Amino acid sequence: MATRIPKTPSTPPAQKPAGDDGDSVVLERRPQKTAPPQMYQVVMLNDDYTPMEFVIVVLQEYFNKDRETATQIMLKIHLDGRGVCGVYSRDLAATKVNQVMEAAHQAGHPLQCVSEPIA
């Protein structure tokens, strides 16, 4: 007796949707590559009038630095004329600068703080 090979089921022909003339174009969505946001560093500038203790308190209160880290940053500001307090997005950096400037103004100190884009 001969062995029979089973028939493979035939696939039905592809059907076009009604009204499709075969000239359709399929667009594929490519994932967009977004660049990370520009980051800014908040920098405090040295002056001869603002007490060192005030700078330490500002670093602790507005930048969440512990006492030791705040003291190190304060000494860098004092010795180098400027020191980086933190790195943030543009809006958050601007907010931090405003908070520091307002606190200095309220306390009667000429402390200056700026934000700079990181290259």
Curated annotation (Swiss-Prot):
SUPFAM superfamilies: ClpS-like. InterPro entries: ClpS (IPR022935), ClpS_core (IPR003769), Ribosomal_bL12_C/ClpS-like (IPR014719). One of its GO terms (biological process) is protein catabolic process. Pfam families: ClpS (PF02617). It comes from the Bacteria. Residues 1-33 are annotated as: Disordered. Involved in the modulation of the specificity of the ClpAP-mediated ATP-dependent protein degradation. HAMAP family: ClpS. NCBIfam families: PRK00033.1-5. Belongs to the ClpS family. Binds to the N-terminal domain of the chaperone ClpA. This is ATP-dependent Clp protease adapter protein ClpS. The gene is clpS.
